[in-house]
């Protein structure tokens, strides 16, 4: 269980009926290590038990929403005994976030990449500033998306376009992501002002009815998302053993283009 896990890498602020969870690793562009994953689950479960909170905002401190999984954690978890607990933690985070009995908003500034993008897709609404860059870029290091990305992308795009986004691994501008239907809103001016406008609009609505609709859809989709998370976990294990993945990691560290061979 991750309840009562304490870390300075995740901040929680509550203002009336709105809670804001902030990833606090600006020096790594809010990369997601095990402490952050556990901290996010802890804060979300704490919020889920509050009858006073209706809206949860997920954001990152500094210049990025989240650059994705921490590459140092990835390199240190070559052993499956370390890998599977991390993947289970990711699954717990995504299931908790997706089924949270609150209205959830991702406020994206800067990069939302890899697992960071998957996490944003698990929320009900994504608002991004015009300078944001969003990427499902696992393929660049010979991996598959995780964090339920196969589920969320197919829901938003359909199977054909979801596969294309995954296979391309392209960095998308906010405009491109909006055109595809991956995000719901681009802040025309200040992100915080646009976020507050969205929050105030929702607070003026019957939020309990909105949350009930969310609960029904989340419960209906729960078995499918759980299955996707399981398939991603074991699929990722296989990809970690490939020559292409090891080449992708080396190329990333050496800041060069990878030479993939399909093995």
Regions found by a protein language model. Name each.
Residues 93-98, 107, 113-166, 180, ...:
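CoA-thioester-processing core
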Residues 2-5, 250-263:
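Terminal low-complexity tails and localization/encapsulation signals of metabolic enzymes
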Residues 127-132, 183-230, 237-243, 259-263:
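C-terminal long alpha-helix characteristic of the crotonase
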Residues 1-61, 95:
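Conserved CoA-thioester-binding segment of acyl-CoA-metabolizing enzymes
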């Amino acid at each position: 269980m991750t309840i009562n896990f304490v870390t300075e890498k995740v901040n929680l602020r509550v203002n009336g009926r709105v809670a804001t969870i902030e990833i606090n690793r600006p020096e790594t562009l809010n990369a997601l290590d095990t402490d952050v994953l556990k901290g996010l689950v802890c804060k979300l479960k704490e919020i889920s038990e509050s009858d006073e909170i209706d809206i949860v905002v997920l954001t990152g401190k500094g210049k990025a929403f989240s650059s994705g999984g921490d590459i140092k954690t990835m390199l240190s978890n070559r052993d499956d005994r370390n890998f599977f607990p991390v993947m289970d933690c990711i699954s717990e985070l995504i299931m908790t976030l997706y089924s949270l009995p609150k209205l959830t908003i991702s406020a994206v500034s800067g990069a939302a990449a890899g697992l960071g993008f998957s996490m944003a897709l698990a929320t009900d609404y994504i608002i991004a500033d015009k300078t944001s860059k969003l990427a499902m870029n696992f393929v660049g290091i010979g991996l598959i998306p995780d964090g339920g990305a196969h589920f969320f992308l197919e829901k938003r795009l359909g199977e054909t376009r979801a596969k294309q986004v995954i296979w391309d691994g392209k960095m998308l501008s906010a405009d491109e992501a909006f055109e595809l239907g991956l995000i719901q809103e681009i802040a025309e001016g200040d992100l915080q002002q646009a976020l507050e406008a969205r929050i105030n609009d929702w607070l003026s609505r019957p939020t309990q009815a909105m949350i009930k609709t969310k609960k029904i859809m989340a419960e209906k989709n729960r078995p499918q998302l759980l299955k996707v998370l399981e398939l991603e976990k074991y699929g990722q294990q296989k990809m970690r053993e490939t020559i292409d993945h090891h080449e992708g990691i080396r190329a990333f560290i050496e800041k060069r283009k990878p030479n993939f061979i399909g093995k």
